[in-house]
Structure formats: structure tokens, C-alpha cells
């Protein structure tokens, strides 16, 4: 998921 915070949980996305 490309969201701030979820990049760690989802394994990708915007920091």
C-alpha cells in the first residue's frame, strides 16, 4: 500500500 506508515507493514510505498 502506498501510504505513509504502511510502507513498513505492506513492504512498499511512500515514506
Swiss-Prot record:
Where is it located?
Answer: Secreted
UniProt keyword list: Adaptive immunity, Blood coagulation, Coiled coil, Disulfide bond, Hemostasis, Immunity, Innate immunity, Secreted
Residue ranges of the TM segments: none
GO CC annotations, alphabetized: extracellular region
Q: List the disulfide bonds.
A: none
Q: Is Repeat included in the keywords of this UniProt record?
A: no
Q: How is it modified after translation?
A: Conversion of fibrinogen to fibrin is triggered by thrombin, which cleaves fibrinopeptides A and B from alpha and beta chains, and thus exposes the N-terminal polymerization sites responsible for the formation of the soft clot. The soft clot is converted into the hard clot by factor XIIIA which catalyzes the epsilon-(gamma-glutamyl)lysine cross-linking between gamma chains (stronger) and between alpha chains (weaker) of different monomers.
Which superkingdom does the taxonomy of this entry point to? Eukaryota
Which example biological process does GO assign this protein? innate immune response
Main localisation:
secreted
Q: What does this protein do?
A: Cleaved by the protease thrombin to yield monomers which, together with fibrinogen beta (FGB) and fibrinogen gamma (FGG), polymerize to form an insoluble fibrin matrix. Fibrin has a major function in hemostasis as one of the primary components of blood clots. In addition, functions during the early stages of wound repair to stabilize the lesion and guide cell migration during re-epithelialization. Was originally thought to be essential for platelet aggregation, based on in vitro studies using anticoagulated blood.
Q: What is known of its domains?
A: A long coiled coil structure formed by 3 polypeptide chains connects the central nodule to the C-terminal domains (distal nodules). The long C-terminal ends of the alpha chains fold back, contributing a fourth strand to the coiled coil structure.
Q: How does it assemble?
A: Heterohexamer; disulfide linked. Contains 2 sets of 3 non-identical chains (alpha, beta and gamma). The 2 heterotrimers are in head to head conformation with the N-termini in a small central domain.
Query: What is the protein named?
Result: Fibrinogen alpha chain
